[in-house]
Swiss-Prot record:
Main localisation: membrane
Disulfide cross-links: none
Keyword tags: Antiport, Cell membrane, Ion transport, Membrane, Plasmid, Sodium, Sodium transport, Transmembrane, Transmembrane helix, Transport
GO MF annotation: an example: sodium:proton antiporter activity
Membrane topology value: Multi-pass membrane protein
Keyword Nuclease: no
GO biological process terms, semicolon-separated: regulation of pH
Native source species: Deinococcus geothermalis (strain DSM 11300 / CIP 105573 / AG-3a)
Protein name: Na(+)/H(+) antiporter NhaA 2
Cellular component GO terms, alphabetical: plasma membrane
Subcellular location per the Swiss-Prot or TrEMBL entry: Cell membrane
Family classification: Belongs to the NhaA Na(+)/H(+) (TC 2.A.33) antiporter family.
Gene name per UniProt: nhaA2
């Protein structure tokens, strides 16, 4: 099978387009926020929308609906991808997961340490989590633009790295950017999640069931004081990945295919449709359904809502510098250092056709923080000046990381032979 038809290559192309779409919407937002019409941008951000159901009422600004509501769907997709990769994907192999985890840990700890060193004792210290994340869509978008110059094993590694990175970001948000918990709603959220876990354990295949439980979980988490997006990750880990028993499936398929009268045939056709839908696991069906929604709506709307940074409002302070150095310097140092440690200790080896020059390039691209870094910025800062500084640092670092990473990989390390073994098995063109 050609590489263009392999599932992973299709995934990379999808993420690549998402990255290009993010660039476009972010650029529109940035220009709009610094244009003579900038007041309309910020007025739209703070326009309130309310939903009422009986006595319950939820009144949030458009910015909060995007960051707390739509982004919960993004985190649901992230959670589904993490679960899939852990159980049957690139993170299911001990050696592969060791390389991704050590590289991701280095890529989170070193940027956070650099940022902290530059902001210790100052009002911007709470932003230490901002430079810890990698935007998988942006990073893979840059790799896709480089075409065949980049070995597929590097794309697989960067994807696994970003997924572990996302998991780390979720934990950081849950543990360090949460305050003022409401125990009543926290209990209701726990009970709802327990119901979802029980449904998954019992093998419930209805996506509508998980949808209803997900909406309730999101509302309770929002009201509990935890960030609402955590609900997306919690729900993802409840959605089952196993498929129906093949023997039962084939028996039901044979029964539904038997000839009969018109009304019987109609009923059996509906049974066949249901069986075909259930042939895939709920996790795969939900992931497949959410991907275009997140790619074409959630992330572009998030970029449009959050990338409008007025340059003159906050200036370039220690927060901006900490984010910039954390992503541009801390990320490659941490990623390459973590990967080197895993290889040195015999825990892992580099993917096929990937050398240390490639790993430096991937470390530079990991400095494209964009989506997650902007998201954490909103949680870290209440002060508008510090928030503007953080966002300015994220945008500048993401652009520079993309240019430096692409430039490094284009130049190549031609004199250095690939040192990785065939750890990544993929379909290549014949």
């Amino acid at each position: 099978m050609a590489a263009s038809h392999s599932p992973f290559t299709r995934f990379v192309h999808g993420e690549s387009f998402a990255g290009l779409l993010l660039v476009g919407t972010a650029l529109i937002a940035f220009i709009w926020a610094n244009s003579p019409w900038r007041e309309t941008y910020f007025a739209a951000q703070h326009t309130h929308l309310a939903l009422s159901l009986g006595d319950a009422r939820l009144d949030l600004s458009l910015e909060h609906w995007v960051n707390d509501g739509l982004m919960a769907v993004f985190f649901l997709l992230v959670g589904l991808e993490i679960k899939r990769e852990l159980l049957i994907g690139e993170l299911s192999s001990r050696r592969r997961v060791a390389l991704a985890v050590t590289a991701a840990l280095g890529g989170m700890l070193v940027p956070a340490a650099l940022y902290t060193a530059l902001n210790v004792g100052g009002p911007g210290l709470s932003g230490w989590g901002v430079p810890m994340s990698t935007d998988i869509a942006f990073a893979l978008g840059v790799l896709a633009l480089l075409g065949s110059r980049v070995p597929l094993g590097l794309k697989v590694f960067l994807t696994a790295l970003a997924i572990v990175d996302d998991l780390g970001a979720v934990l950081v948000i849950a543990l360090f950017y949460t305050s003022g918990l409401n125990l009543t709603f926290l209990t209701l959220a726990a009970l709802t999640w327990g119901a979802a876990l029980y449904a998954g354990w019992r093998g419930a295949f209805s996506l509508k069931l998980y949808g209803v439980l997900g909406v309730l979980l999101w509302f309770f988490v929002l009201k509990s004081g935890l960030h609402a997006t955590i609900a997306g990750v919690l729900l993802a880990f409840a959605v089952p990945i196993r498929r129906p028993d093949p023997a039962d499936y084939l028996a039901s398929l044979a029964e539904a295919a038997k000839p009969g009268r018109g009304e019987v045939v109609g009923a059996r056709l509906r049974d066949l449709e249901d069986l075909l839908e259930r042939a895939q696991s709920p996790l795969h069906r939900l992931e497949h359904a959410l991907h275009p929604f997140v790619t074409f709506l959630v992330l572009p709307v998030f970029a449009l809502t959050n990338a409008g940074v007025p340059v003159a409002a906050g200036g370039f302070g220690s927060v901006s510098l900490g984010v910039l150095l954390g992503l541009l310097l801390g990320k490659p140092l941490g990623v390459v250092g973590g990967a080197w440690l895993a290889v040195r200790m015999g825990m892992a080896s580099l993917p096929r056709r990937v050398n240390w020059g490639h790993m430096v390039g991937s470390g530079l691209l990991a400095g494209i923080g964009f989506t997650m870094s902007l998201f954490v910025s909103n949680l870290a800062f209440d002060d508008s000046v510090l928030l503007t500084q953080a966002k300015l640092g994220v945008l500048l670092a993401s652009v520079l990381a993309a240019l430096l990473g692409a430039g490094w990989l284009l130049l190549g390390i031609r004199g250095q032979a690939p040192s990785g073994r065939d750890d990544v098995q993929v379909d290549l063109p014949r």
